[in-house]
């Protein structure tokens, strides 16, 4: 994945790839989304967080004890670096892996502010000691900067700024 993004030298192809991703929103599944949202708010600076618990009529169909409905999440939405993500509890109790399909936080660096914002975000992540860094956020041979890390929940992330 890293090679794909850093190897794109042709600006036309890069812009075409970016446009094809418009409208795609990562939808993550967790055992405890309420807890995960708190983590993303604390460590990633997530904002505009909304969370919906299931109604009592859904409790039976999801196999949830009505006493803990307020702890469960059927839908949530939040922003990280201006990018929208969604999440819900994994009601099927199936093992899921977010490691094989990284979430890309892709920022344009035309104004320079995006590079500063991404660097501040990266520094905060690393200082938290609550992520595992696989590749530092640094300049790439094809331009821009890229960093790769995994969070507490096993979600892999790419932070990319293209000049």
Residue ranges and their predicted role:
Residues 4-19, 50-51, 71, 79, ...:
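Vicinal oxygen chelate
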Residues 20, 28-83:
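Core segments of cupin and vicinal oxygen chelate
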